[in-house]
């Protein structure tokens, strides 16, 4: 009798163990609910694995020691990296009862780091592009500026100054520009249309002055700003990288803004690769 009891007890233990291995006696509905629960856990854990990869990529861009056109992007990326690293998730144990499994799964479905990662990657990409754009306008070659200006609507001709033909006399001098490219525009009234582009100066359309450093460009821009609103006003002026973009005072305010934007967009267009053309080939060009 004792052996029979032991045999029955052993059989019960084995059966219980089998139940644990095969789902601890869960119904098909409970098994399906548990699978859905585990699926959500795996989804969230996969997002965190992707987070680690995205953070590593973002940190590489953040570590680039070059200026960006938008100086707000680097601190913005630092914030995104910090917030992404703070994302946490500890997988809970699956409940046993159907109602509890379903409720827990519903809570897991509310956890989604997709938008966090999208924002991290967006700011990372924006900073990367901004750095590359800034490189284009950091002491660019004269030929690059000329080629950019030639493709802009309402710019009819361009001419780069030389040391022999430089009205301001600042080419290659200490604190002066390394290149100055004037352009003429059909938007300006007739008196300037038949003039020598360089002699007409900024009044004939505008110009782009290139400096060695952003500080030198800003210093020049601040100087021009002292004449704004007066009889000696020379038109609009804006610094981008180490370039000073100027438009004629003979243009309307709207025309100045549109022209300035078009020039900056062209200079910072990543499709416009810097060229190694000889400066002698870009002294003067007129579109027909």
PLM regions with names:
Residues 2-6, 24-138:
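Amphipathic alpha-helical assembly segments used for oligomerization, scaffolding, or translocation
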């Amino acid at each position: 009798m004792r052996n029979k009891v032991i045999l029955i007890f052993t059989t019960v233990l084995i059966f219980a163990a089998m139940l644990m291995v095969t789902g601890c006696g869960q119904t098909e509905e409970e098994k399906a609910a548990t699978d859905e629960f585990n699926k959500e856990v795996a989804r969230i854990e996969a997002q965190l694995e992707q987070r680690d990869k995205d953070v590593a990529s973002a940190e590489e861009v953040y570590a680039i020691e070059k200026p960006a056109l938008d100086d707000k992007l680097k601190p913005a990326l630092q914030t995104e990296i910090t917030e992404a690293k703070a994302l946490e998730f500890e997988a809970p144990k699956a409940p046993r009862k159907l109602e509890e499994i379903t409720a827990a799964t519903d809570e897991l479905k509310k956890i989604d780091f997709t938008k966090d990662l999208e924002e991290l990657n967006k700011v990372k990409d924006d900073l990367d592009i901004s750095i590359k754009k800034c490189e284009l306008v950091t002491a660019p070659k004269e030929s690059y500026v000329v080629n950019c200006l030639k493709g802009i609507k309402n710019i009819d001709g361009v001419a780069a100054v030389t040391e022999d033909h430089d009205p301001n006399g600042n080419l290659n001098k200490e604190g002066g520009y390394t290149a100055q490219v004037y352009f003429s525009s059909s938007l300006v009234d007739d008196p300037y249309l038949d003039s020598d582009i360089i002699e007409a100066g900024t009044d004939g359309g505008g110009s782009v002055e290139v400096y060695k450093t952003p500080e030198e460009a800003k210093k020049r821009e601040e100087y021009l700003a002292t004449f704004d609103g007066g009889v000696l006003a020379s038109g609009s002026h804006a610094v981008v990288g180490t370039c000073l973009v100027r438009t004629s005072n003979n243009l309307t305010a709207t025309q100045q803004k549109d022209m300035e934007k078009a020039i900056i967009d062209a200079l910072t267009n990543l499709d416009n690769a810097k060229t190694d053309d000889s400066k002698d080939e870009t002294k003067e060009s007129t579109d027909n």
